[in-house]
Amino acid sequence: MLSNLIPFDSSKQMDERITDRTIGELIHAAYAMGEVKTGALIVVEQNIILQEYEKTGIAMDSLISSQLLINIFEHNTPLHDGAVIVRNNRIVSATCYLPLSDNLELNKSLGTRHRAGVGISEVSDALTIIVSEETGKVSYTYGGKIIIGVTPGALRERLNSMKTRKDHKETTGLARIWKGRAKHEEKTGK
C-alpha cells in the first residue's frame, strides 16, 4: 500500500497546491455548512498523494467552489457520505473512506467523521477540515492533532501556511506514513 502514496513532484510551484481562491471557497463552504449543521469532511492533500483512499470514492475532476462542496455534503444525496479529497485546487474524489484513529486520548464525544479526520492526518501530511453535524463547529486536523471550533481566520491562516511549505517536509510525511502503517500492522498482526 505504501507504493500508492506518492510524493508530489518537487519541481512544481508551491502555490499550485492551494490558491487564495481555493482557500476562500473551502472556508466559505465549511462555515455555510456549519450554520445549518451539515456534516462534512474535506481532505486537502499536501506532499503525499492519497491514491489509496481516493480509489475508495467516486472519481471527480472539478474546480473547487463552495456551492459544489455544499451540494456534495447535502443530506440524502449520493455523495454526502465519506470524505472529499482535494488535490492541486481540484476535487479529485468524493465519498472516500478514510482510516479511523485508534488514539484513546481523543475525546469520547468525537464521532466517526472526526476520528477519520484525525486518522488520515496520522498516516499522511494532509490537512482535514471537519464540520460537525451535531454542533456545526468547524475543526481541522493535522499531524494527528485536532483543533476543534476554529474561527474562519484561524482556518485561513492554517491553509495559507500550506502554500509555503518547505520541500524538506516531504520526507517527514513519508516517515509518518511508514510509522503509522507499522503501528497498524503490529496491532493487527499483519
PLM region spans:
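Divalent-cation
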Residues: M1-K190
